[in-house]
Amino acid sequence: MRILYLLFSLLFLALQVSPGLSSPRRDMLFCKGGSCHFGGCPSHLIKVGSCFGFRSCCKWPWNA
């Protein structure tokens, strides 16, 4: 029965980190004016930091 609690807590943690369920406002707070992208940045943007989870904070080169 204790392992069931552990599985539910891990599932809850995984759902919080997933990109579709996180708050866009919280991501923008971490990014500070850039845009958050899952994984790496597109080729025309540069990485300036990280957003919540596995996202990269990307900005235009002339705004960085």
UniProtKB/Swiss-Prot annotation:
Keyword presence, Secreted: yes
Single GO biological process annotation from the record: defense response to bacterium
Tissue and organ distribution: Expressed in circulating heterophil granulocytes and bone marrow (at protein level). Strong expression in the bone marrow, lung and testis. Moderate expression in the bursa and intestine. Low expression in the cloaca, gall bladder, brain, pancreas, trachea, air sacs and spleen. Expressed in the vagina, ovarian stroma and the theca layer of the ovarian follicle, but not in the granulosa layer of the ovarian follicle.
Induction: Not induced in the ovarian follicle by intravenous injection of LPS. Expression in cultured vaginal cells is increased by LPS and S.enteritidis.
Keywords: Antibiotic, Antimicrobial, Defensin, Disulfide bond, Secreted, Signal
GO cellular component terms, semicolon-separated: extracellular space; secretory granule
Domain of life: Eukaryota
Predominant subcellular localization, coarse grouping: secreted
Signal peptide per UniProt: 1-22
Gene Ontology MF terms: CCR6 chemokine receptor binding; chemoattractant activity
Keyword set includes Aminoacyl-tRNA synthetase: no
Cellular location(s): Secreted; Cytoplasmic granule
Annotated S-S bridges: 31-57, 36-51, 41-58
Pro-peptide positions on chain: 23-28
Family in the record: Belongs to the beta-defensin family.
Role this protein plays: Potent antibacterial activity against the Gram-negative bacterium E.coli ML-35, and against the Gram-positive bacterium L.monocytogenes EGD. Lacks antifungal activity against C.albicans.
Protein name per UniProt: Gallinacin-2
Naturally occurring in which organism (per UniProt): Gallus gallus
